[in-house]
Design a protein with these regions (language model features):
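N-terminal periplasmic "start-of-domain" segments of outer-membrane beta-barrel proteins
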Residues: 34-68, 93-95, 112
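N-terminal periplasmic accessory domains that precede
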Residues: 73-76, 95-96, 112-115, 128, ...
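Extracytoplasmic beta-strand/coil segments of soluble accessory domains associated
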Residues: 74-119
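Short acidic/polar hinge/loop motifs at secondary-structure boundaries
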Residues: 112, 117-143, 223
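Transmembrane beta-barrel wall of Gram-negative outer-membrane proteins
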Residues: 177-206, 211-249, 271-294, 348-350, ...
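Membrane-embedded beta-barrel scaffold of Gram-negative outer-membrane proteins
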Residues: 294-312, 462, 468-474, 501-560, ...
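Structural signature of Gram-negative outer-membrane beta-barrels, strongest in the C-terminal barrel
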Residues: 351-355, 359-361, 395-534
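Gram-negative outer-membrane beta-barrel transporters
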Residues: 353, 411-418, 426, 526-535, ...
Protein backbone atom coordinates (compact mmCIF):
# COMPACT_ATOMS: atom_id res chain seq x y z
CA UNK A 1 0.00 0.00 0.00
CA UNK A 2 2.82 2.37 0.89
CA UNK A 3 4.53 1.84 -2.48
CA UNK A 4 1.27 2.31 -4.36
CA UNK A 5 0.56 5.66 -2.67
CA UNK A 6 4.00 7.04 -3.46
CA UNK A 7 3.74 5.77 -7.04
CA UNK A 8 0.39 7.51 -7.54
CA UNK A 9 1.72 10.74 -6.05
CA UNK A 10 4.82 10.61 -8.24
CA UNK A 11 2.64 10.03 -11.28
CA UNK A 12 0.46 13.02 -10.41
CA UNK A 13 3.44 15.32 -9.97
CA UNK A 14 5.01 13.99 -13.17
CA UNK A 15 1.79 14.70 -15.05
CA UNK A 16 1.80 18.28 -13.82
CA UNK A 17 5.46 18.56 -14.78
CA UNK A 18 4.98 17.47 -18.40
CA UNK A 19 4.20 20.54 -20.53
CA UNK A 20 3.88 18.39 -23.61
CA UNK A 21 0.72 16.76 -22.31
CA UNK A 22 -1.03 20.13 -22.40
CA UNK A 23 0.42 21.34 -25.73
CA UNK A 24 -1.48 21.62 -28.99
CA UNK A 25 -0.33 19.74 -32.08
CA UNK A 26 1.46 21.63 -34.80
CA UNK A 27 4.24 24.23 -34.71
CA UNK A 28 5.15 25.49 -31.28
CA UNK A 29 5.15 29.30 -31.12
CA UNK A 30 8.21 31.08 -29.77
CA UNK A 31 7.67 32.13 -26.15
CA UNK A 32 9.50 34.70 -24.04
CA UNK A 33 9.65 33.64 -20.40
CA UNK A 34 8.53 36.31 -17.96
CA UNK A 35 10.80 37.49 -15.18
CA UNK A 36 10.26 35.61 -11.94
CA UNK A 37 10.86 36.54 -8.29
CA UNK A 38 11.31 34.49 -5.13
CA UNK A 39 8.13 34.45 -3.02
CA UNK A 40 9.42 32.85 0.20
CA UNK A 41 10.57 34.91 3.18
CA UNK A 42 10.79 34.47 6.94
CA UNK A 43 10.92 38.27 7.47
CA UNK A 44 8.33 39.93 5.23
CA UNK A 45 5.21 38.66 3.48
CA UNK A 46 5.29 41.28 0.71
CA UNK A 47 6.72 38.87 -1.89
CA UNK A 48 3.80 36.42 -1.98
CA UNK A 49 2.39 35.34 -5.36
CA UNK A 50 -0.38 32.74 -5.33
CA UNK A 51 0.00 32.02 -9.07
CA UNK A 52 3.42 30.43 -8.45
CA UNK A 53 3.09 29.13 -4.89
CA UNK A 54 3.38 25.29 -4.94
CA UNK A 55 1.95 24.84 -1.43
CA UNK A 56 -1.49 25.18 0.17
CA UNK A 57 -1.71 28.74 1.47
CA UNK A 58 -4.54 30.95 2.68
CA UNK A 59 -4.26 34.72 3.15
CA UNK A 60 -6.63 36.92 5.16
CA UNK A 61 -6.50 40.72 5.15
CA UNK A 62 -7.01 42.90 8.17
CA UNK A 63 -10.20 44.23 6.60
CA UNK A 64 -11.61 40.69 6.36
CA UNK A 65 -10.65 39.98 9.97
CA UNK A 66 -12.19 43.18 11.34
CA UNK A 67 -15.40 42.62 9.35
CA UNK A 68 -16.01 39.42 11.33
CA UNK A 69 -15.98 41.23 14.71
CA UNK A 70 -14.42 38.08 16.13
CA UNK A 71 -13.60 37.85 19.82
CA UNK A 72 -10.77 35.35 19.25
CA UNK A 73 -8.66 33.87 16.46
CA UNK A 74 -10.70 30.67 16.41
CA UNK A 75 -13.56 32.50 14.72
CA UNK A 76 -11.14 33.92 12.14
CA UNK A 77 -9.47 30.63 11.17
CA UNK A 78 -12.53 28.35 11.28
CA UNK A 79 -13.13 28.82 7.53
CA UNK A 80 -9.74 27.26 6.72
CA UNK A 81 -9.93 23.48 6.25
CA UNK A 82 -7.41 21.29 8.04
CA UNK A 83 -7.05 23.70 10.98
CA UNK A 84 -8.00 22.73 14.54
CA UNK A 85 -7.51 24.96 17.58
CA UNK A 86 -7.37 24.23 21.29
CA UNK A 87 -8.81 27.24 23.12
CA UNK A 88 -7.94 28.10 26.69
CA UNK A 89 -9.99 31.27 27.18
CA UNK A 90 -9.58 34.64 25.50
CA UNK A 91 -6.90 34.74 22.80
CA UNK A 92 -4.77 32.01 24.43
CA UNK A 93 -4.81 29.09 22.00
CA UNK A 94 -2.89 26.27 20.35
CA UNK A 95 -3.09 25.94 16.55
CA UNK A 96 -2.76 22.55 14.84
CA UNK A 97 -2.80 21.50 11.16
CA UNK A 98 -3.81 18.32 9.40
CA UNK A 99 -4.11 16.09 12.44
CA UNK A 100 -0.54 16.56 13.64
CA UNK A 101 -0.61 16.50 17.49
CA UNK A 102 -4.42 16.40 17.58
CA UNK A 103 -4.18 13.49 20.02
CA UNK A 104 -2.36 15.68 22.56
CA UNK A 105 -4.03 18.30 24.72
CA UNK A 106 -1.58 19.33 27.43
CA UNK A 107 1.73 21.20 27.20
CA UNK A 108 3.19 19.74 24.01
CA UNK A 109 4.34 21.77 21.03
CA UNK A 110 1.70 21.89 18.26
CA UNK A 111 3.92 21.29 15.21
CA UNK A 112 3.02 24.71 13.77
CA UNK A 113 5.39 27.69 13.66
CA UNK A 114 3.89 31.08 14.64
CA UNK A 115 5.67 34.11 13.19
CA UNK A 116 4.69 37.73 13.93
CA UNK A 117 6.45 40.39 11.82
CA UNK A 118 9.25 37.91 11.21
CA UNK A 119 9.59 37.12 14.92
CA UNK A 120 9.11 33.43 15.82
CA UNK A 121 6.94 33.43 18.95
CA UNK A 122 6.00 30.48 21.10
CA UNK A 123 5.40 29.46 24.68
CA UNK A 124 6.83 26.50 26.52
CA UNK A 125 3.36 24.91 26.54
CA UNK A 126 2.92 25.27 22.77
CA UNK A 127 0.20 27.89 23.14
CA UNK A 128 0.40 31.38 21.72
CA UNK A 129 -1.15 34.71 22.73
CA UNK A 130 -2.18 36.83 19.74
CA UNK A 131 -3.51 40.39 19.87
CA UNK A 132 -6.42 40.25 17.46
CA UNK A 133 -6.68 44.06 17.32
CA UNK A 134 -3.19 44.46 15.83
CA UNK A 135 -3.38 42.24 12.75
CA UNK A 136 -2.82 43.61 9.24
CA UNK A 137 -2.86 40.19 7.57
CA UNK A 138 -2.61 36.46 8.27
CA UNK A 139 -1.03 33.89 5.98
CA UNK A 140 -1.44 30.18 6.67
CA UNK A 141 1.03 27.72 5.11
CA UNK A 142 0.07 24.05 5.39
CA UNK A 143 2.47 21.13 5.08
CA UNK A 144 6.01 20.75 6.39
CA UNK A 145 7.47 24.28 6.57
CA UNK A 146 10.82 23.81 8.31
CA UNK A 147 12.48 24.66 4.98
CA UNK A 148 11.75 28.31 5.86
CA UNK A 149 10.85 28.46 9.54
CA UNK A 150 13.00 25.79 11.14
CA UNK A 151 12.20 23.79 14.26
CA UNK A 152 8.66 22.52 14.99
CA UNK A 153 7.15 23.48 11.61
CA UNK A 154 6.11 19.84 11.14
CA UNK A 155 2.68 20.68 9.72
CA UNK A 156 2.93 24.32 8.66
CA UNK A 157 3.18 27.92 9.79
CA UNK A 158 1.01 30.94 10.59
CA UNK A 159 2.54 34.26 9.49
CA UNK A 160 1.01 37.37 11.05
CA UNK A 161 1.77 40.90 9.88
CA UNK A 162 0.80 43.64 12.32
CA UNK A 163 -0.79 46.97 11.45
CA UNK A 164 1.45 49.54 9.79
CA UNK A 165 1.60 52.27 7.18
CA UNK A 166 -0.36 55.36 6.23
CA UNK A 167 -3.69 53.50 6.30
CA UNK A 168 -3.65 53.88 10.10
CA UNK A 169 -3.37 57.68 10.12
CA UNK A 170 -5.98 59.75 11.91
CA UNK A 171 -7.89 59.03 15.09
CA UNK A 172 -10.07 55.97 15.60
CA UNK A 173 -12.18 54.84 18.56
CA UNK A 174 -14.07 51.53 18.56
CA UNK A 175 -16.09 49.46 21.02
CA UNK A 176 -17.90 46.11 20.93
CA UNK A 177 -20.10 44.32 23.46
CA UNK A 178 -21.35 40.75 23.51
CA UNK A 179 -22.66 37.87 25.57
CA UNK A 180 -21.27 36.86 28.97
CA UNK A 181 -19.88 40.31 29.68
CA UNK A 182 -17.73 40.51 26.57
CA UNK A 183 -16.34 44.02 26.00
CA UNK A 184 -13.80 45.39 23.57
CA UNK A 185 -12.41 48.92 23.38
CA UNK A 186 -9.81 50.33 21.01
CA UNK A 187 -8.28 53.78 20.50
CA UNK A 188 -5.74 54.55 17.79
CA UNK A 189 -3.91 57.67 16.63
CA UNK A 190 -1.66 57.83 13.57
CA UNK A 191 0.28 60.29 11.43
CA UNK A 192 1.82 60.06 7.98
CA UNK A 193 3.99 62.24 5.74
CA UNK A 194 6.11 61.77 2.64
CA UNK A 195 9.02 60.31 4.62
CA UNK A 196 7.45 58.52 7.56
CA UNK A 197 4.27 57.01 8.96
CA UNK A 198 3.39 55.74 12.39
CA UNK A 199 0.65 54.98 14.86
CA UNK A 200 -0.01 54.01 18.47
CA UNK A 201 -2.91 51.83 19.53
CA UNK A 202 -4.39 50.95 22.92
CA UNK A 203 -6.89 48.10 23.16
CA UNK A 204 -8.68 46.06 25.82
CA UNK A 205 -10.77 42.88 25.79
CA UNK A 206 -12.51 41.17 28.69
CA UNK A 207 -15.31 38.70 29.37
CA UNK A 208 -16.77 36.61 32.16
CA UNK A 209 -17.20 33.63 29.82
CA UNK A 210 -19.81 30.89 30.01
CA UNK A 211 -17.69 28.40 31.95
CA UNK A 212 -17.09 28.62 35.70
CA UNK A 213 -14.05 30.71 36.74
CA UNK A 214 -13.10 31.33 33.10
CA UNK A 215 -13.02 35.11 33.07
CA UNK A 216 -10.24 36.77 31.10
CA UNK A 217 -8.89 40.23 30.41
CA UNK A 218 -6.18 41.65 28.16
CA UNK A 219 -4.75 45.14 27.72
CA UNK A 220 -2.34 45.92 24.89
CA UNK A 221 -0.28 48.85 23.67
CA UNK A 222 0.99 48.47 20.10
CA UNK A 223 2.75 50.75 17.67
CA UNK A 224 4.63 50.93 14.39
CA UNK A 225 6.93 53.58 12.93
CA UNK A 226 8.33 53.48 9.39
CA UNK A 227 11.02 55.77 7.99
CA UNK A 228 11.81 56.11 4.29
CA UNK A 229 15.59 56.51 4.41
CA UNK A 230 15.77 57.27 0.69
CA UNK A 231 14.04 56.29 -2.52
CA UNK A 232 14.91 52.61 -2.18
CA UNK A 233 15.34 51.78 1.52
CA UNK A 234 13.29 52.00 4.71
CA UNK A 235 13.46 51.16 8.40
CA UNK A 236 10.47 49.88 10.38
CA UNK A 237 10.15 49.70 14.17
CA UNK A 238 7.39 47.59 15.65
CA UNK A 239 6.52 47.22 19.32
CA UNK A 240 3.84 45.59 21.42
CA UNK A 241 3.28 45.34 25.18
CA UNK A 242 0.43 43.25 26.48
CA UNK A 243 -0.83 42.23 29.92
CA UNK A 244 -3.19 39.27 30.10
CA UNK A 245 -5.09 37.49 32.83
CA UNK A 246 -6.96 34.23 32.43
CA UNK A 247 -8.38 32.06 35.17
CA UNK A 248 -9.46 28.51 34.28
CA UNK A 249 -9.29 26.86 30.86
CA UNK A 250 -12.92 27.53 29.99
CA UNK A 251 -13.69 24.01 28.80
CA UNK A 252 -15.16 20.72 29.99
CA UNK A 253 -13.82 17.25 29.26
CA UNK A 254 -15.90 14.62 27.49
CA UNK A 255 -19.58 14.24 26.62
CA UNK A 256 -20.51 13.08 30.12
CA UNK A 257 -19.28 16.24 31.82
CA UNK A 258 -20.76 18.35 29.02
CA UNK A 259 -24.17 16.82 29.77
CA UNK A 260 -24.01 16.76 33.57
CA UNK A 261 -21.80 19.76 34.32
CA UNK A 262 -21.77 21.98 31.19
CA UNK A 263 -20.28 25.02 32.98
CA UNK A 264 -17.53 23.02 34.68
CA UNK A 265 -18.47 23.97 38.24
CA UNK A 266 -17.42 20.58 39.62
CA UNK A 267 -13.81 19.63 40.06
CA UNK A 268 -10.70 21.75 39.68
CA UNK A 269 -8.42 22.39 36.72
CA UNK A 270 -4.84 21.29 37.20
CA UNK A 271 -3.68 24.87 36.52
CA UNK A 272 -5.38 28.26 36.75
CA UNK A 273 -4.93 31.96 37.56
CA UNK A 274 -2.57 32.80 34.69
CA UNK A 275 -0.88 36.23 34.69
CA UNK A 276 0.97 36.85 31.43
CA UNK A 277 3.15 39.84 30.49
CA UNK A 278 4.30 39.96 26.86
CA UNK A 279 6.73 42.33 25.14
CA UNK A 280 7.83 42.34 21.50
CA UNK A 281 10.21 44.75 19.77
CA UNK A 282 11.46 44.30 16.20
CA UNK A 283 13.46 46.47 13.80
CA UNK A 284 13.33 45.68 10.07
CA UNK A 285 15.58 47.13 7.35
CA UNK A 286 14.73 46.83 3.66
CA UNK A 287 16.86 48.03 0.74
CA UNK A 288 16.10 47.62 -2.96
CA UNK A 289 19.70 47.47 -4.14
CA UNK A 290 18.46 47.45 -7.72
CA UNK A 291 15.22 46.82 -9.56
CA UNK A 292 16.01 43.09 -9.29
CA UNK A 293 17.77 42.78 -5.92
CA UNK A 294 16.51 43.32 -2.37
CA UNK A 295 18.17 43.07 1.05
CA UNK A 296 16.16 42.46 4.22
CA UNK A 297 17.43 42.39 7.80
CA UNK A 298 15.60 41.92 11.10
CA UNK A 299 16.58 42.21 14.76
CA UNK A 300 14.09 41.33 17.48
CA UNK A 301 13.41 40.60 21.12
CA UNK A 302 10.37 38.81 22.53
CA UNK A 303 9.70 38.43 26.26
CA UNK A 304 7.11 36.33 28.06
CA UNK A 305 6.71 36.40 31.84
CA UNK A 306 4.01 33.98 33.00
CA UNK A 307 2.92 33.15 36.55
CA UNK A 308 0.22 30.63 37.47
CA UNK A 309 -1.05 28.15 40.07
CA UNK A 310 -0.95 24.39 39.61
CA UNK A 311 -1.62 21.11 41.45
CA UNK A 312 -4.89 21.44 43.43
CA UNK A 313 -4.43 20.87 47.15
CA UNK A 314 -6.06 17.68 48.45
CA UNK A 315 -4.80 17.58 52.04
CA UNK A 316 -3.50 20.15 54.48
CA UNK A 317 -0.15 19.82 56.24
CA UNK A 318 -1.96 17.94 59.02
CA UNK A 319 -3.68 15.54 56.58
CA UNK A 320 -7.15 17.15 56.68
CA UNK A 321 -9.07 17.03 53.35
CA UNK A 322 -9.10 20.27 51.31
CA UNK A 323 -11.75 20.90 48.65
CA UNK A 324 -11.74 24.68 48.16
CA UNK A 325 -11.63 25.63 44.44
CA UNK A 326 -8.96 28.22 45.28
CA UNK A 327 -6.63 25.81 47.13
CA UNK A 328 -3.53 25.06 45.06
CA UNK A 329 -0.10 23.84 46.13
CA UNK A 330 2.38 25.12 43.53
CA UNK A 331 3.28 28.59 42.28
CA UNK A 332 4.95 28.69 38.85
CA UNK A 333 7.14 31.60 37.74
CA UNK A 334 8.36 31.39 34.13
CA UNK A 335 10.51 33.90 32.21
CA UNK A 336 11.17 33.49 28.50
CA UNK A 337 13.38 35.75 26.36
CA UNK A 338 13.92 35.25 22.64
CA UNK A 339 16.48 37.35 20.78
CA UNK A 340 17.58 37.02 17.20
CA UNK A 341 18.84 38.54 13.98
CA UNK A 342 18.35 37.35 10.44
CA UNK A 343 18.94 38.63 6.94
CA UNK A 344 17.84 37.70 3.43
CA UNK A 345 19.18 38.66 0.01
CA UNK A 346 17.05 37.99 -3.05
CA UNK A 347 17.67 38.65 -6.71
CA UNK A 348 16.19 37.90 -10.13
CA UNK A 349 17.94 36.95 -13.36
CA UNK A 350 15.23 36.63 -15.99
CA UNK A 351 13.41 33.30 -15.62
CA UNK A 352 15.44 32.38 -12.53
CA UNK A 353 15.41 33.88 -9.04
CA UNK A 354 16.90 32.97 -5.69
CA UNK A 355 16.96 33.98 -2.05
CA UNK A 356 19.61 33.24 0.56
CA UNK A 357 19.16 33.79 4.29
CA UNK A 358 21.01 33.46 7.57
CA UNK A 359 19.51 33.40 11.08
CA UNK A 360 20.94 33.53 14.60
CA UNK A 361 18.78 33.03 17.69
CA UNK A 362 19.46 33.05 21.41
CA UNK A 363 16.59 31.93 23.62
CA UNK A 364 16.60 31.75 27.40
CA UNK A 365 14.01 30.14 29.68
CA UNK A 366 14.02 30.62 33.45
CA UNK A 367 11.68 28.41 35.45
CA UNK A 368 11.06 28.43 39.20
CA UNK A 369 8.35 26.67 41.20
CA UNK A 370 7.68 26.57 44.93
CA UNK A 371 5.03 25.44 47.41
CA UNK A 372 2.35 28.08 48.01
CA UNK A 373 1.11 26.35 51.18
CA UNK A 374 2.05 23.51 53.46
CA UNK A 375 0.41 20.24 52.41
CA UNK A 376 0.51 16.47 52.29
CA UNK A 377 -0.16 14.19 49.32
CA UNK A 378 -2.17 11.77 51.48
CA UNK A 379 -3.84 11.76 54.91
CA UNK A 380 -1.42 9.11 56.17
CA UNK A 381 0.59 10.19 59.25
CA UNK A 382 3.58 8.43 57.63
CA UNK A 383 3.49 10.97 54.78
CA UNK A 384 6.07 13.68 55.30
CA UNK A 385 4.43 17.14 54.82
CA UNK A 386 5.79 19.66 52.35
CA UNK A 387 6.47 23.02 53.95
CA UNK A 388 5.22 26.28 52.43
CA UNK A 389 8.00 27.94 50.45
CA UNK A 390 9.74 24.68 49.49
CA UNK A 391 11.48 25.19 46.12
CA UNK A 392 10.80 22.41 43.63
CA UNK A 393 12.59 23.73 40.55
CA UNK A 394 14.99 26.57 39.84
CA UNK A 395 16.52 26.07 36.42
CA UNK A 396 17.65 27.76 33.24
CA UNK A 397 17.56 26.51 29.66
CA UNK A 398 19.53 28.22 26.90
CA UNK A 399 19.09 27.65 23.17
CA UNK A 400 21.58 28.79 20.57
CA UNK A 401 20.31 28.33 17.03
CA UNK A 402 22.06 29.07 13.75
CA UNK A 403 20.51 28.49 10.36
CA UNK A 404 21.31 28.87 6.67
CA UNK A 405 18.41 28.70 4.23
CA UNK A 406 17.56 29.50 0.65
CA UNK A 407 14.93 29.33 -2.06
CA UNK A 408 15.20 29.12 -5.83
CA UNK A 409 12.50 29.52 -8.47
CA UNK A 410 12.81 28.61 -12.12
CA UNK A 411 10.20 29.47 -14.75
CA UNK A 412 10.47 26.33 -16.86
CA UNK A 413 7.94 27.54 -19.41
CA UNK A 414 5.42 30.35 -19.68
CA UNK A 415 3.03 28.78 -17.18
CA UNK A 416 5.35 26.42 -15.27
CA UNK A 417 7.36 27.34 -12.16
CA UNK A 418 9.65 25.01 -10.22
CA UNK A 419 10.48 25.96 -6.62
CA UNK A 420 13.18 24.47 -4.41
CA UNK A 421 14.13 25.20 -0.79
CA UNK A 422 16.92 24.05 1.52
CA UNK A 423 17.63 24.87 5.16
CA UNK A 424 20.19 23.68 7.72
CA UNK A 425 19.67 24.24 11.45
CA UNK A 426 22.17 23.86 14.28
CA UNK A 427 20.51 23.80 17.73
CA UNK A 428 22.61 23.89 20.91
CA UNK A 429 20.94 23.33 24.29
CA UNK A 430 22.41 24.11 27.69
CA UNK A 431 20.47 23.23 30.81
CA UNK A 432 21.46 24.22 34.35
CA UNK A 433 19.50 23.63 37.55
CA UNK A 434 20.26 24.77 41.07
CA UNK A 435 20.24 22.19 43.88
CA UNK A 436 16.68 22.30 45.26
CA UNK A 437 14.22 19.92 46.86
CA UNK A 438 12.73 18.79 43.55
CA UNK A 439 16.05 17.41 42.24
CA UNK A 440 17.21 16.08 45.64
CA UNK A 441 19.54 19.06 46.10
CA UNK A 442 21.73 18.06 43.17
CA UNK A 443 23.10 20.68 40.78
CA UNK A 444 22.56 19.83 37.11
CA UNK A 445 24.56 20.96 34.08
CA UNK A 446 23.78 19.31 30.73
CA UNK A 447 24.75 20.18 27.13
CA UNK A 448 23.34 18.79 23.88
CA UNK A 449 23.30 19.79 20.22
CA UNK A 450 21.35 18.76 17.12
CA UNK A 451 21.73 19.28 13.37
CA UNK A 452 18.75 19.12 11.03
CA UNK A 453 18.19 19.61 7.30
CA UNK A 454 14.87 20.57 5.70
CA UNK A 455 13.78 20.89 2.08
CA UNK A 456 10.90 21.51 -0.30
CA UNK A 457 10.49 20.78 -4.00
CA UNK A 458 7.34 22.13 -5.63
CA UNK A 459 5.81 22.74 -9.04
CA UNK A 460 2.96 25.03 -10.14
CA UNK A 461 1.10 25.43 -13.45
CA UNK A 462 -1.11 28.40 -14.33
CA UNK A 463 -2.01 27.59 -17.93
CA UNK A 464 -5.78 27.89 -17.44
CA UNK A 465 -7.51 31.20 -16.78
CA UNK A 466 -7.71 32.00 -13.05
CA UNK A 467 -6.49 28.49 -12.18
CA UNK A 468 -3.33 27.18 -10.53
CA UNK A 469 -2.42 23.52 -10.18
CA UNK A 470 0.35 22.73 -7.72
CA UNK A 471 2.21 19.91 -6.04
CA UNK A 472 5.07 19.67 -3.57
CA UNK A 473 7.12 17.47 -1.29
CA UNK A 474 8.33 19.19 1.89
CA UNK A 475 9.85 18.25 5.23
CA UNK A 476 9.68 19.35 8.85
CA UNK A 477 11.50 18.52 12.07
CA UNK A 478 11.29 18.90 15.83
CA UNK A 479 14.23 18.66 18.23
CA UNK A 480 13.89 16.88 21.60
CA UNK A 481 13.21 19.15 24.56
CA UNK A 482 15.27 19.41 27.73
CA UNK A 483 12.38 17.82 29.61
CA UNK A 484 12.47 14.78 27.33
CA UNK A 485 16.25 14.47 27.45
CA UNK A 486 16.82 14.94 31.18
CA UNK A 487 13.56 14.15 33.00
CA UNK A 488 15.33 11.76 35.36
CA UNK A 489 17.71 14.48 36.56
CA UNK A 490 14.92 17.03 36.89
CA UNK A 491 12.75 14.71 39.01
CA UNK A 492 14.87 11.88 40.45
CA UNK A 493 11.97 10.82 42.69
CA UNK A 494 9.87 10.03 39.62
CA UNK A 495 9.85 6.94 37.41
CA UNK A 496 11.16 8.46 34.15
CA UNK A 497 14.86 8.20 33.33
CA UNK A 498 17.12 10.42 31.24
CA UNK A 499 17.62 9.67 27.55
CA UNK A 500 20.26 11.99 26.05
CA UNK A 501 20.36 9.87 22.87
CA UNK A 502 17.00 11.00 21.48
CA UNK A 503 16.91 11.86 17.77
CA UNK A 504 14.99 14.71 16.15
CA UNK A 505 11.47 13.94 14.94
CA UNK A 506 11.07 14.11 11.16
CA UNK A 507 8.05 14.67 8.92
CA UNK A 508 7.62 14.53 5.15
CA UNK A 509 4.59 16.08 3.44
CA UNK A 510 3.17 15.10 0.03
CA UNK A 511 0.56 17.37 -1.52
CA UNK A 512 -1.28 18.02 -4.80
CA UNK A 513 -3.88 20.77 -5.12
CA UNK A 514 -5.67 23.47 -7.08
CA UNK A 515 -6.59 27.14 -6.61
CA UNK A 516 -9.26 28.76 -8.78
CA UNK A 517 -11.30 31.95 -8.94
CA UNK A 518 -14.54 32.09 -10.94
CA UNK A 519 -18.01 33.64 -11.10
CA UNK A 520 -20.79 32.00 -9.12
CA UNK A 521 -24.30 33.46 -9.43
CA UNK A 522 -22.84 36.75 -10.68
CA UNK A 523 -20.49 36.93 -7.68
CA UNK A 524 -16.75 36.37 -7.50
CA UNK A 525 -15.90 33.05 -5.86
CA UNK A 526 -12.71 31.21 -4.94
CA UNK A 527 -12.01 27.51 -4.60
CA UNK A 528 -8.99 25.74 -3.15
CA UNK A 529 -8.62 22.01 -2.72
CA UNK A 530 -5.75 19.67 -1.92
CA UNK A 531 -5.01 16.05 -1.10
CA UNK A 532 -2.14 15.47 1.31
CA UNK A 533 -0.20 12.96 3.34
CA UNK A 534 2.18 13.66 6.23
CA UNK A 535 4.44 10.83 7.38
CA UNK A 536 6.28 11.24 10.68
CA UNK A 537 9.12 9.10 11.98
CA UNK A 538 11.12 8.95 15.22
CA UNK A 539 8.01 10.12 17.08
CA UNK A 540 9.00 10.95 20.70
CA UNK A 541 6.82 9.67 23.54
CA UNK A 542 7.20 8.46 27.13
CA UNK A 543 7.43 4.66 27.07
CA UNK A 544 4.80 4.59 29.82
CA UNK A 545 2.38 5.78 27.16
CA UNK A 546 0.52 9.03 26.66
CA UNK A 547 -0.56 10.63 29.97
CA UNK A 548 -0.05 7.40 31.93
CA UNK A 549 1.84 6.76 35.14
CA UNK A 550 4.76 4.42 35.64
CA UNK A 551 6.13 2.55 38.61
CA UNK A 552 9.43 1.23 39.86
CA UNK A 553 8.97 -2.09 38.08
CA UNK A 554 9.05 -0.35 34.71
CA UNK A 555 11.85 2.15 34.23
CA UNK A 556 10.36 4.48 31.64
CA UNK A 557 11.98 7.21 29.57
CA UNK A 558 11.26 9.20 26.44
CA UNK A 559 12.04 7.28 23.26
CA UNK A 560 11.73 7.65 19.50
CA UNK A 561 8.91 5.14 19.65
CA UNK A 562 7.87 4.96 15.98
CA UNK A 563 5.86 6.79 13.35
CA UNK A 564 2.51 8.43 12.59
CA UNK A 565 0.61 9.35 9.44
CA UNK A 566 -2.02 11.95 8.59
CA UNK A 567 -3.72 11.92 5.20
CA UNK A 568 -6.79 13.59 3.83
CA UNK A 569 -8.65 15.95 1.55
CA UNK A 570 -9.30 19.66 2.07
CA UNK A 571 -11.76 21.90 0.24
CA UNK A 572 -12.54 25.59 0.75
CA UNK A 573 -15.18 27.54 -1.20
CA UNK A 574 -15.91 31.23 -0.61
CA UNK A 575 -18.28 33.72 -2.23
CA UNK A 576 -20.95 36.32 -1.41
CA UNK A 577 -24.65 36.88 -1.99
CA UNK A 578 -24.55 40.69 -1.70
CA UNK A 579 -22.04 43.41 -0.85
CA UNK A 580 -22.99 43.02 2.81
CA UNK A 581 -23.24 39.22 3.02
CA UNK A 582 -20.62 36.56 2.33
CA UNK A 583 -20.41 32.82 2.93
CA UNK A 584 -17.80 30.12 3.07
CA UNK A 585 -17.66 26.34 3.04
CA UNK A 586 -14.75 24.40 4.56
CA UNK A 587 -14.51 20.62 4.43
CA UNK A 588 -11.78 18.32 5.72
CA UNK A 589 -11.50 14.56 5.48
CA UNK A 590 -8.74 13.40 7.82
CA UNK A 591 -7.35 9.98 8.70
CA UNK A 592 -4.59 9.99 11.33
CA UNK A 593 -2.98 6.89 12.78
CA UNK A 594 0.21 5.52 14.29
CA UNK A 595 2.14 3.55 11.66
CA UNK A 596 4.62 2.19 14.21
CA UNK A 597 4.41 2.08 17.99
CA UNK A 598 7.26 0.33 19.78
CA UNK A 599 5.75 -0.89 23.06
CA UNK A 600 8.43 -1.17 25.71
CA UNK A 601 6.23 -2.30 28.62
CA UNK A 602 5.60 -5.87 27.49
CA UNK A 603 4.02 -8.39 29.84
CA UNK A 604 7.12 -10.60 29.84
CA UNK A 605 9.31 -7.92 31.41
CA UNK A 606 11.46 -4.90 30.75
CA UNK A 607 13.20 -5.12 27.33
CA UNK A 608 16.36 -3.43 28.59
CA UNK A 609 17.11 -6.03 31.25
CA UNK A 610 16.03 -7.23 34.67
CA UNK A 611 15.42 -4.87 37.57
CA UNK A 612 17.26 -5.96 40.71
CA UNK A 613 16.87 -4.29 44.11
CA UNK A 614 20.01 -2.57 45.38
CA UNK A 615 19.08 -2.41 49.06
CA UNK A 616 19.74 1.33 48.99
CA UNK A 617 16.14 2.44 49.36
CA UNK A 618 16.78 5.00 52.07
CA UNK A 619 14.68 8.03 52.92
CA UNK A 620 10.96 8.68 53.06
CA UNK A 621 10.45 8.64 49.28
CA UNK A 622 12.37 5.74 47.70
CA UNK A 623 12.52 5.74 43.91
CA UNK A 624 13.84 3.60 41.10
CA UNK A 625 17.08 5.61 40.83
CA UNK A 626 18.38 4.43 44.20
CA UNK A 627 16.34 1.24 44.68
CA UNK A 628 16.91 -0.67 41.45
CA UNK A 629 19.47 -1.27 38.75
CA UNK A 630 19.26 -3.01 35.39
CA UNK A 631 21.34 -6.16 34.93
Amino acid sequence: MKTTQKTLLAAAVAALAAPGTWAQTGPVPTQTLRQTTVTGSTIDDRFGDSTREPTSTVSLSGREIEAQHADNLVQVLKAIPGVTIDTQGGDDLKIKFRGVENQRYMGEKPGVAIVIDGVPVFERTGKVNINLDNIESIKVIKGGASYLFGEDALAGAVIITTKRGATNKGVSVETDVGAYGYQRELARIGRASDNWSGHLQLSQRKADDYHFQSNYKSQALAGNLRWLLNGHSDLTLGLEKEDRFRDKHGTVTGVTQAALDPRGTLGRDYARHFDVDLERVNLTYSNDLSDRTNLLALAYQYRDHTQFWSAPQRFSSTGAPVSSPDAYTTFNDYHQTQRGVKSELRTTTGPMAWMGGVEFKRNEYLNKTHAMVGYRNSPSPMERPTAAGTVFTDDRTGENEQALYGEGQWRLATDWTLTGNLRHDRIELDYDAKPVSGNRNSAIAERKSFDANSARLGLSWSGLANTVLFGNISTGFRAPTVDQLYRGSQSPSGSVANNPDLKTEQAINFEVGMRKTFTLMDREASLQTAVFQIDRKDFILDTNGQYSNGNAAHVARYENIGGARSRGLELALQSSISPAWSWDLAYTYLDSTFTQYDQFLLAQGNPRGTLVGTGACAGPNPNWNNCYQLV
